[in-house]
Amino acid sequence: MPVLFLFIFCYLFIYISFTFGYPMKTGFSCPPKKIWHNLLHSAKMCDIIIKLTKNIDKLRYDMIEIKVNGKIKKVPVGTRVIDVLEGYDKKRDIVCQVGAQVKEINYALSEKHDGMEIKPLGLSHSEASKAYETTLRFLIAMAFRNVYPNVKIRFSYNASRSVYCEALNKTFNMSRAVEPIKNEVKRLIDADLKIERLSLPVEELSNLYAKSNMKDKLDVLSYRPEKSAHTYKCGDYYNYLHSYMVASTGCISDYSITPYSPGIIIQYPRHELNAEIPEFVEESTYGRTLQQAYKWAKKTKLQTIPEVNRKIERDNLLEFIQMCEARHNAMLSDLGRAIEADIENIRLIAIAGPSSSGKTTFCNRVRIELLSRGIEPVMISLDDYYFEKEVICKIQNKPREELDLEHINCLDVELFNKDLFDLINGEEVTLPKFDFTTGKRVKGRTIRVENNSPIIIEGIHALNERLTASIPKHRKFKIYIAPQAQMNIDDHSPLSTTNLRLIRRIVRDMSFRNCPAATTIDMWQSVRDGEFKWIYPHQEGADFVFNSSLSYELCVLKTRALPALKKIKYTDPQYLIANRLIKYLKYFTPITDESLIPCNSLIREFIGGSCFKV
């Protein structure tokens, strides 16, 4: 209303001035010499009115409407989410959902959030669990700064869904530090210190990190294309772990810090376990592979993104790529020797791993490795043993649209075991063939397997004992494949191998299935749910773990993934995940000359140009 009154007053003033001139002793008359002056004055006032009317919309948005717990609320622009949530519980409400986006709980609302619904998210949500874990790492890093200011630490993801922390100072005894660090973390939590997200010029932030002797942070900032960057401030401590965090230290309550020589293990509530901390299980086979990956990255100086970039910028690029491929060749050679040493007993080679691990290319390379040792394997596809959907509907007692097509009961396990048993015993078998065009199972090829020819199978259930129950354990050789890159953005921010696989899948789906990045991201949680249910419970039963990561691959994938991810709009529900992937892909120096990559490389399965049928 005040704007409207101002508009009317200004209009009347202009009208009177232009028509009658200024009040004079002789009355309201306008001498000719004043006309041009009045016109000029009126023009200026009109300009003012135009500017005012342009701002009416802006003034109207001083207040926005939001929906909280089913109620419509009017709040001023700039209001924090934490201030509008009814019954806010800092230990329960970790992050929030604003419209389609997940935000921090103390996020400030703006005009673009007008009409959106807001709800808190607890630890049963994946993004809340991630923010919680990130904050826990932040607190532990802060505790080390407070108690042992000269000690440098590094975090990495570890077996049993945990985080591993080690001291980079060779002489530091981490076992003695466990109790002091636990006490300091508890003190910080009890103090309920505010955690504030800041945006600072890169130069100013670099000075802050330099004063704190955070050389790893400075290295990363040198590759940042933007002129400003985010950081988090808690008291006098600054750090950024490349993810959202909680509002204050007091939001953290449930966690575990235990010694695990030569470092410590950190555990936290997992969303897939309904906010429970998983029991720590010693996964010796898987853990050994992680340790080998860590040692190799350390020896070759490929532990962080800046180190990878320096290999590309300063060294011979072809040499770098061939070095990474040579490591895969060496692992395949180790695998071939292990199978050859027991070939008299091994009749079945079972290969499994999570999505986008490179299983198809790997199976072909295992076959060639065995051929080089005089062993002629036979490959059988588990896909050919799928039941038709009508049969699966009866088995699962569900309509077609609700079927769990990853369930083991979608496979004809009985027929598969019978065919395996007969083949291993030297009989001729006519295999089934599943026609995915018609959705029907038909007759396939007829084969007989020689005594020295192991059968290779690959699929999500390949390591499940139920699938191959007719074959004695000593006659099976199980292989688990997954990328286990022990690489960090910086010392406190390990790269998730899950995100690496998602980037691989985005690139593959675009290249071979004409599928946009948003669709792949939409499907990803369902893929992950299937992995937790059908793959991870059986990984420790593997006789061999193959690490399919290549230290240079994200430099190659970046050139394809980044443009696709940037097409996802802020208002799209996939934006949060897309933006997270963009945030660390942008730091990699791109490799654009794909001709340097061998045609049998595992990465060819995702970018194309493979010599194998993928």
Where are these regions (language model features)?
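Hydrophobic positions on the alpha1 helix immediately C-terminal to the Walker A/P-loop
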Residues: 362, 366
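Short, positively charged and aromatic/hydrophobic N-terminal segments
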Residues: 11, 15-22, 37-54, 58
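Auxiliary tRNA-acceptor-end handling modules of aminoacyl-tRNA synthetases
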Residues: 95, 99, 110-130, 143, ...
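Short beta-strand-centered segment that lines the nucleotide-binding/catalytic pocket of NTP-utilizing
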Residues: 372-389
